[in-house]
Amino acid sequence: MKPSWLQCRKVTGAGTLGAPLPGSPSVRGAGVARRALVAGFGGRGCRALTTSSGGGEYKTHFAASVADPERFWGKAAEQISWYKPWTKTLENRYPPSTSWFVEGMLNICYNAIDRHIENGQGDKIAIIYDSPVTDTKATISYKEVLEQVSKLAGVLVKQGVKKGDTVVIYMPMIPQAIYAMLACARIGAIHSLIFGGFASKELSTRIDHVKPKVVVTASFGIEPGRKVEYMPLLEEALRIGQHKPDRLLIYNRPNMEKVPLMSGRDLDWEEEMAKAQSHDCVPVLSEHPLYILYTSGTTGLPKGVVRPTGGYAVMLNWTMSSIYGLKPGEVWWAASDLGWVVGHSYICYGPLLHGNTTVLYEGKPVGTPDAGAYFRVLAEHGVAALFTAPTAIRAIRQQDPGAALGKQYSLTRFKTLFVAGERCDVETLEWSKKVFRVPVLDHWWQTETGSPITASCIGLGNSKTPPPGQAGKCVPGYNVMILDDNMQKLKARSLGNIVVKLPLPPGAFSGLWKNQEAFKHLYFEKFPGYYDTMDAGYMDEEGYLYVMSRVDDVINVAGHRISAGAIEESVLSHGTVTDCAVVGKEDPLKGHVPLALCVLKKDVNATEEQVLEEIVKHVRQSIGPVAAFRNAVFVKQLPKTRSGKIPRSTLSALVNGKPYKVTPTIEDPSIFGHIEEVLKQAL
C-alpha cells in the first residue's frame, strides 16, 4: 500500500535537517588530560554548553531540539513517507513514556524498500552479503529485496500472522534474517530477533515471554571451524518451555544437509516461497511496536525493549546523514550481529531507510581467515564508513600489531571509522587512526535508546579530531546531564550519574514487553524527570562526554569513588597490555581495592612481575595514589559477550569468591575456569 499523504522527499544531502555540513572544526591537541576521577559537586548539562569548539550547525540543531523538540522532529519526520499525518508531534499522556507523531500512520518496510524503487532506485544495491565462513559473496538490489520480503510477508499471512502478532527470528547472519525482519514489519507483526546459537534455556525463556505465532529459523549457523545446529537448540527450547508456536519456518542453508521437518508444524522456506503471493504493506500507528529486543544478560523476568515504529524510522533516517555523514547510495558497514541493537538499527533499518548499501558480514575480525579480514571487506566493497566495537580492533591488533595484513588493500573510499559498544581506550583509538588512516570516532548509546545518545555528529559539522577518551557530544534530542545521587548537578570533570532530561527523543524505547512497572522503576524512579542510563562518567568544559563505566562498576576505595574504566585506560596506555578489566576486590581496610585482569601483548619480553611493577607505577602517576592500585593478574584471554562487552559484574563475583552466573551471551565460558585457576595461584 502506497502512502497517499506526505510523499518522501529524497534525502540528497542538502535538506534543512540532516544535511551533511562538514564546517571547519578546530583541531584539538592530542594530549590526554588527566581524568577527574573523584566525585565532586557542582552543575553542568548539555543545554548550557555553547562553547567555541567548532560545529556551529551542530549547536544550532542541538539548541533547536531542546527548545522546540516538536518543531525539530516534525521537520525531520518529513523525510519519511506517512499514510496518515500525525495530529500531535509529541505527547506525554502516560509519563514517563513520550509518544511521538501521535495518530500518524506509516510502514517502515515501505520506507526502507518500496519508496526507493518508486523513486527509480530499484537496481541500486541494498545488501552486500559477505560470508568468509561459507566462501559466499552476493549483491542484492532493492528490487530483489522487495521480491523476497513481499513473498515472505505472504507466507506469514498465510500462516495466520496478522498485525500485532509476534514472530521470533532465530537465524545466523544471512540475508534471510533481514528479509524476515522486513516481512514482519511489512504486515505489522512484531519481530523478536534472537541471535542464532543462543542457548536453549534462554531461548525458551524468551519464546515463553513473547509467545510467537511463528518461529523463523535456519538449519545451521557457521562459526570458524565449526557448524552450529540450530534445530536441536530450538527443539530443546520448545520442549522445556510452555509456549508452542503454531509453525516453524525453516530455511535450509545451501550446500548443507537438509534438516527433517515435523509434519503439521514445520514449513520449508523454499517450498513456501515458491508458492507464495506477494503481500502489500500494512499501515500501522506510529506507536505500534516494531520489535522486541531482549537485553543481554537478562535474569529473572526477561527485559524486552519495545521499539515504536514511527519515531524509530525518523531518528534512524536522520542519524545516517547527521551523525554518520553519509549520502544515499554510499556503502555502510556495521560489523555487528543482527541479534544486537546495532544490528537492528544499523545493519537493517537505518541504512535501508536512508537509501544506502548495507554490508552483511558473516565472519569475525580475526580467524576468517586472518586479521586482514576487515581491510579486505572495506577495500573490496568500497565501504565509506565502518561501525565496529573496540574489542574487534583489539583482536586485530593483538594478532597483527603492525597491521601488515591490511597493507595490501587500498581503502580509497573509506572515510570514517565509528566505534561503540564499550569504552574505547586511547591506546586502541590511536592505533586505529594510524592503521586505517581515517578519523576514528567513539560514540555512546544503549539498547534502550536504539541510536546514539552522544556522538561526533560529523554531518552537522562536529570535529573529526575530538579529544581522546571522549564519546562525543549530546546528539540533538538527548539533553545529557551529570548528577550525584542527590540529584545535584555536577561541575565539569566530576564523576557522576549520566542521565537524560525528559522527554526522550523519537526512536527511544516505549516500554518493556509485558513489564511496564519495571520500565518505570528501573529507568525513571531514581531521578524523577530524567532517564537513568545507569552509566557513570563526566563532561568536560567543551561538552564532550566521557563514559567511564556502569554505575555498578564505580569502585569505592576508602570513601573515594574511582572509575574502573579510568584505571583500565591507564593500564592499557602503558603499552604492554592488549586487554584489561578492572574490578573491585573486597578489602578489610579500604572496603574495596582495584584488581586488574590483564592480557599481555605477544611481543612482551619482560616477566609478569616486572610488568606488574611498571603498571602499578604508571597508574599511580596517571591517576594518583587515591586509586590504591597495587595488584594485577595476567590471563590468556578475557571473557566477552558476542557484542564485545566484558561481564564485569560476573568477574567481580568471581574475584571475590562469590557465586556467579555465566550468561548465555558469553562466547567462550571456559575462560572463567582459567581465570579462577590464575587467581588461586596469584592471590
Swiss-Prot record:
Name by which UniProt lists this protein: Acyl-CoA synthetase short-chain family member 3, mitochondrial
* One function term, GO molecular function aspect: medium-chain fatty acid-CoA ligase activity
The UniProt catalytic activity note for this protein reads: acetate + ATP + CoA = acetyl-CoA + AMP + diphosphate; propanoate + ATP + CoA = propanoyl-CoA + AMP + diphosphate; butanoate + ATP + CoA = butanoyl-CoA + AMP + diphosphate
Q: From the Swiss-Prot or TrEMBL record, state where the protein is found.
A: Mitochondrion matrix
- What processes in GO biological process is this protein linked to? lipid metabolic process
Q: Which Pfam families match?
A: ACAS_N, AMP-binding, AMP-binding_C
Q: Which domain of life is it from?
A: Eukaryota
Modified sites of kind N6-succinyllysine: K514
**Tissue specificity note:** Expressed in a wide range of tissues, with the highest levels observed in the liver followed by kidney.
> What family classification does the UniProt entry report for this protein?
Belongs to the ATP-dependent AMP-binding enzyme family.
List the EC numbers from the record: 6.2.1.1, 6.2.1.17
Residues of the transit peptide: 1-29
Its chief place of residence is: mitochondrion
Which principal EC class is assigned to this enzyme? ligase
What keywords is this UniProt entry annotated with?
Acetylation, ATP-binding, Ligase, Lipid metabolism, Mitochondrion, Nucleotide-binding, Transit peptide
Described function: Catalyzes the synthesis of acetyl-CoA from short-chain fatty acids. Propionate is the preferred substrate but can also utilize acetate and butyrate with a much lower affinity.
Sequence positions that bind CoA: E223, P224, G225, R226, R620
Query: Binding residues for ATP, per the UniProt record?
Result: G421, E422, R423, D442, H443, W444, W445, Q446, T447, D535, R550, R561
The record's listing under PANTHER family reads:
ACYL-COA SYNTHETASE, ACYL-COA SYNTHETASE SHORT-CHAIN FAMILY MEMBER 3, MITOCHONDRIAL
Gene Ontology CC terms: mitochondrial matrix
